[in-house]
């Protein structure tokens, strides 16, 4: 089996596109959530909160020929990937285009504006709203295909459209592709664009925050006063590489990916199950050859939903007790759906290198219905971590767990 390392990583978030910018916002202890008064036009939509990326602009050097089939979700994915490849020292490298580099990337759905166009067609009985690229922008694998085409990646394409585990499964399946010798390099991650149609999905489940007048107080993962999640948007990309290839080309190695597991609850499409969440984490530990005590930090899924936080906390505590530091980055960016697993893995690795781990903001009184955990609160925590775990869970009962090892 091949060893797999991270040689590049980047993202596009509501806090910026680089670690110094994101770190400054994390350390300020404020979230990216804002009121969305424009959503008032949707009768029956209760939440008016989101965490949009307000300043995203497609780079001027992107040619129209390569972007005309991109919706916003593909644009976010492509920019995050360009930044990650640059950090890996792979911009215009021949390995990208000789078949040895693939892509495993996902989003919950494609872009949402094309869906509206098809709705107009069905309602008006006219195809006037449809163009040659409408479907390509909305297809479930649009982010993987567009990012792959943009950089000329000729290896395997693994689209991961699995809701909130799209990004983490992308990383995990990329890891497996390299580990088993199918590819030398993999671009991996996830993206999501903001749309009120995503908010209403959770609204109908009574799972969205109603703190419309106090966006700075939501979401509140694991807190007694939490009242639901907030939708966000963004993209995250990791460049995974076979260790010997990375060393041969003199790449800067950020971390090693040593464990990945994914499984399914097979119980209920929207109600998470503690037992299989726990099993997923145990499987990742077993693959990495680690004990629970070896993990120095856990990046929680932490959505701030009632059932999700309870199930996750009990699954985590059953393995780690209350001794392993844990926090949820969704308290800052909201739930970025298909992007969250990749964004959270990227930022967890940045924090491991920094030695400072962000707290779960708005967590002031842990819910007694949740299992006791070592929540990172307040101003964050300085930690020397050799291994970290990043967990994500999704509709359909899909669970993922990734384990990264500090390099050097």
Would you name each region that the model predicts?
Residues 10, 60-70, 105, 125-137, ...:
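Cysteine-centered functional microenvironments
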Residues 3-7, 31-35, 213-288, 297:
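Condensing-enzyme catalytic core mediating Claisen C-C bond formation in acyl metabolism
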Residues 8, 26, 81, 103, ...:
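Conserved small-residue
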Residues 124-131, 172, 176, 193-248, ...:
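Glycine-/small-residue-rich "gating" segment that lines the acyl/pantetheine channel
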Residues 35, 182-227, 260-274, 302-309, ...:
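Acyl-CoA/ACP chain-elongation machinery
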């Amino acid at each position: 089996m091949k060893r797999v390392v991270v040689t590049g990583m980047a993202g596009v978030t509501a806090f910026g596109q680089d670690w110094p910018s994101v770190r400054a916002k994390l350390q300020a202890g404020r979230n990216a959530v804002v009121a969305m008064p424009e959503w008032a036009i949707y009768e029956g939509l209760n939440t008016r909160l989101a965490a949009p990326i307000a300043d995203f602009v497609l780079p001027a050097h992107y040619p129209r020929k390569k972007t005309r089939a991109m919706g916003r979700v593909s644009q976010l994915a492509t920019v995050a990937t360009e930044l990650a490849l640059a950090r890996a020292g792979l911009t215009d490298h021949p390995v990208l285009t000789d078949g040895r580099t693939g892509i495993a990337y996902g989003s919950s759905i494609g872009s949402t504006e094309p869906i509206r166009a098809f709705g107009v067609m069905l309602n008006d009985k006219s195809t006037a709203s449809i163009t040659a690229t409408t479907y390509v922008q909305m297809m479930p694998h649009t982010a993987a295909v567009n990012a792959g085409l943009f950089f000329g990646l000729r290896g395997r394409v693994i689209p991961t459209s699995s809701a909130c585990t799209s990004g983490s499964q992308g990383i995990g399946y990329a890891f497996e592709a390299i580990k088993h010798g199918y590819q030398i390099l993999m671009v991996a991650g996830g993206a999501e664009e903001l749309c009120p149609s995503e908010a209403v999905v959770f609204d109908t489940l009574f799972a969205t925050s109603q703190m419309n007048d106090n966006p700075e107080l939501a979401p509140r993962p694991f807190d007694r006063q939490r009242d639901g999640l907030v939708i966000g948007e963004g993209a995250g990309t990791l460049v995974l590489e076979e260790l010997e290839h990375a060393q041969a080309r003199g790449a800067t190695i950020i971390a090693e990916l040593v464990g990945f597991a994914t499984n399914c609850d097979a119980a209920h499409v929207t109600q998470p199950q503690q037992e299989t969440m726990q099993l997923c984490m145990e499987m990742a530990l077993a693959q990495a050859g680690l004990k629970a005590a070896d993990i120095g930090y856990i990046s929680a899924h932490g959505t701030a939903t009632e059932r999700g936080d309870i199930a996750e906390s009990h699954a985590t505590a059953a393995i780690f007790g209350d001794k392993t530091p844990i926090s949820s980055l969704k308290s800052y960016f909201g739930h970025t759906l298909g992007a969250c697993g990749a964004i959270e893995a990227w930022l967890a690795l940045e924090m491991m290198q920094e030695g400072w781990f962000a707290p779960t903001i708005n967590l002031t009184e842990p819910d007694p219905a949740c299992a006791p955990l070592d929540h990172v609160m307040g101003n964050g925590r300085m930690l020397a971590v050799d291994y970290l775990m990043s967990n994500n869970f999704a509709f359909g009962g899909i669970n993922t767990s990734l384990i990264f090892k500090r390099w050097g």
